[in-house]
């Protein structure tokens, strides 16, 4: 995925998920995506290079970092629980969708049971 499409694609995929809120609590240079008031994705740039921060299971995080050169420990985040995704040939829309969905689900899993039922009906 190239530099221009990383943010656009990630934003579109995140906003397809139920009950997602887009806000800018850290200023206009950080798109912040929340579910139930908790952050699951941040989108910004570092020295002109776009990146996406996503919550990640620690084991999956390490595996993805070994497989995909464009996935690094989370920039300015807890490196055990967050990853940063940078532009790269190996970053496909399908991979990005899986990473975003995993992040959303990890955050929802941490919500109160009543909130989980509200955002994950059925």
From Swiss-Prot:
Pfam families: YjbR (PF04237)
Top-level taxon of the source organism: Bacteria
SUPFAM superfamilies assigned: YjbR-like (SSF142906)
Protein name in UniProt: Uncharacterized protein YbdF
Natural source organism: Escherichia coli (strain K12)
Gene name per UniProt: ybdF
